[in-house]
Each structure stands twice: as structure tokens, then as C-alpha cells.
């Protein structure tokens, strides 16, 4: 699990101080943070990253190489998969369909399906089980550019289209624009904060 980001105000209501560990001395006023009162006590900033095994019937994404916090850039290739009701990951790559991958502990969750009923949960599990055995998704059929993980996930969503806005499934570019980019853009703000704190020990942020 990544180091958690904490936010607090010490001496000024105009500036937030973000850090992993509360500094002994306030970077704004230079006073001891242990012996002086804080305007706002430390609280956790919720991370957008999650362990895929804790999700249910969700689209999940992660960098193809490395992880979001330390390696991701806007130019990074992203790998995409789907979880079933038990949080088991179904992914398609050069190995074909892999079930139960363990390297999804730091991913972004995309709730394309919205609020689900028991009927939809059952359909998700059934659809994934069928697709995992379908010859369309064997390693021989995989192509990095024309038949990849995005095609697998989009076909899964088409198969349960009664709970998905099908407009986003018309093309891979439209799917990325409407579904993936909003999630990665929001996560990018957290990742930027994380990296600044990892380098400088804290981040001083103007209150909006």
C-alpha cells in the first residue's frame, strides 16, 4: 500500500500543508508543531488507487509497465481488465485470458456499470466465465494494436449493454475519451502531490 497523504493547517488558514509524516517544525512559521496548536488537525487525503481484489464487477486500469505512483506519465500505455463479483481479475494480453492476476494491488477503479442488481452481478460472472473460454480471446488471437485488452473489456461491456451507456463503446478512442481519461486525469492530481511530497517531504498548497 502506498504511503498515505495527510493534510493540515498550522498557522495560516490560507495554506494547507500536505505530507506523509507531520514535520516537527512548521515549514511556514518555523514553530514546533508538537507544542503549538494547529488550525486544522491532520486528516487523510483519500487515494484514488485501490486493490482490484476489493472491487466487484468493475473495470480496472493500471500502467502496462510499473505503477501509477512512481512510473505513470500521460504517455504511458495502460492495461485494462474487469473484475467479477469476488474481485477476481479477468485480463487479456499476449498470454490470452488470465484469471486471478495478483499484480492489481494499485489500480484505478472505473465504475462503468453504476449501481448493480443481483441479476446483473450474476450476468457479469457468467459473461466473464464464457469469455475466458471463448476462442476469440486466445493468445494466438491477441494483437497489440488491433485485438487487445481494450477490445476484451469493451466486448464484455457490450455483452451486458443493458446496464452500460453503449455510446462509449462505439470505438476504442471514444471509450478512452469518455471513460478512461476522466479517471486518469483526476488521479493525476493525487499522483503529482504524492511525487512532490516524496521528493520535498511536504507540499504547501494555497487554499482555493
Model segments located where?
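Activation targets extended, charge/polar-rich intrinsically disordered C-terminal tails
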Residues: 2-13, 19-32, 132-208
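Alpha-helical and coiled-coil interaction segments, frequently adjacent to or embedded
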Residues: 13-14, 80
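Glycine-rich catalytic cores of cysteine/serine-nucleophile enzymes that process amide/ester linkages
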Residues: 38, 44, 52-115
